[in-house]
Structure formats: structure tokens, C-alpha cells
Amino acid sequence: MPLSEAAVKVQAALQERGLETPMLPSVFTPEERKDKIEHHMKEILTLMSLDLSDDSLADTPRRIAKMYVDEIFSGLDYANFPKITVIDNKMGFDEMVRVQDISLTSTCEHHLVTIDGTATIAYLPRKKIIGLSKINRIVRFFAQRPQVQERLTQQVLVALQTLLETKDVAVKMDAVHYCVKSRGVMDSTSSTTTTALGGIFKSNPATRAEFLHQSK
């Protein structure tokens, strides 16, 4: 299936800036990927001495394969990029548009465990205005990959800048990393904050302060 114009533009913008997730070209269909993941997951679980003949575990390899391809890693396939509604700013609206407390669930690419957090997005309309739900969908698309939070924040920024045809976009993310919470140092209270600021949000101290203050 050919990619949408929005998906092509966003992918090219990320590649140009060196912000694309490290990926190899896929030579398999989604169903072929599921079959191969299921096969290898059976081997992994067997190596862990789990009895896959037990009815509780028998379908686990297939469940994981479907979850990886259709859900938590679906953002690796630009065919799943959300349908984007961007309209001309005919009303001349020029005040800050802000969407906050966007829920996001991603996966740490170092240990493949959960990143759980929220995002706040703002932009100053110029030529284009985007449907509000599309902002949430763009966050979700890029979260549905193995990620590091710093890259995820930048990817959402560049995607919105590309689609809105303006640099005046700001992104802030706050998240708990289960690679910190459930293993290693096992710190259950810390969280990580990242920001990506463009245009006037980066160059104008008052606009930056307004965004960051309201994001608390």
C-alpha cells in the first residue's frame, strides 16, 4: 500500500535531520513478520525453561507477535501513520494552540520495557491548522516504537513542524521508565522530562516561559 503524502513528508524530514528511528527496510508483510516473531519467541521462551504445552502459555508466542506488529511497535511501519487533517488558517488565528496531558505509552529500546508518560504540545498557527485529535495520534504513532525519550520528543516536534509548515512548535514529555523502575537501580519515584522547542518557543524567552510554566 502506498504511503500517504503526510507520511512521506514526515519520514523524509526525520531522515534529513538524522532523527529517524534506526530501522532496516522491511522485506516481509505484517503477517510474515508475525509468523517469524512467533517462531523465534517460542525458542526464547523454551530457552527460559517455560513449558509451552501448558494451556496458559501455548498461545503466548502468537500473542506477543501480534502485539509487536499490530500494537506496541506498529509505529515502525509508516503505512500506519495517522490520516492527517490540516486546513488553511483562513480565520487568521495567531494565538497559542495547546494540547496537554496527552497519554503516551512507549517501549525503551534498550531493554524493551515500558515508558509511561504524558505529552504537552503547543504551536502558533501560521498558514495551517491541524485537527486537535491528530496531535494525539501523531504522539501515539511515534510512541509505538522502541524509543528513547529524547528522540521521541524531537520526532513529534519535526512531524508537526513539517505538517503545519511552521517552526513555531513546542513539545514537552514527562515519563516514567520501567527500565529504571522495575530493574537495575529500581527507583520507583523518579521521572524524566524532555523538551523540544522550535521557532519562537526557542528564540523568545517570554513565549518559552509561558509554555513551560503552563506545562507544570
Curated annotation (Swiss-Prot):
Broadest EC class assigned to this enzyme: hydrolase
Record note on quaternary structure: Toroid-shaped homodecamer, composed of two pentamers of five dimers.
Protein name (database record): GTP cyclohydrolase 1
GO biological process: one-carbon metabolic process; tetrahydrobiopterin biosynthetic process; tetrahydrofolate biosynthetic process
Keywords per UniProt: GTP-binding, Hydrolase, Metal-binding, Nucleotide-binding, One-carbon metabolism, Zinc
Species, as recorded: Shewanella oneidensis (strain ATCC 700550 / JCM 31522 / CIP 106686 / LMG 19005 / NCIMB 14063 / MR-1)
HAMAP family, per the entry: FolE
Catalytic activity: GTP + H2O = 7,8-dihydroneopterin 3'-triphosphate + formate + H(+)
Gene Ontology MF annotations: GTP binding; GTP cyclohydrolase I activity; zinc ion binding
Pathway(s) it belongs to: Cofactor biosynthesis; 7,8-dihydroneopterin triphosphate biosynthesis; 7,8-dihydroneopterin triphosphate from GTP: step 1/1
Keyword Chaperone applies: no
Gene3D superfamilies in UniProt: 1.10.286.10, 3.30.1130.10
PANTHER family recorded: GTP CYCLOHYDROLASE 1, GTP CYCLOHYDROLASE I
Family designation: Belongs to the GTP cyclohydrolase I family.
Top-level taxon in the UniProt lineage: Bacteria
Annotated positions binding Zn(2+): 108, 111, 179
InterPro entries documented for this protein: GTP-CH-I_C/QueF, GTP-CH-I_N, GTP_CycHdrlase_I, GTP_CycHdrlase_I_CS, GTP_CycHdrlase_I_dom
EC id: 3.5.4.16
GO cellular component, one term: cytoplasm
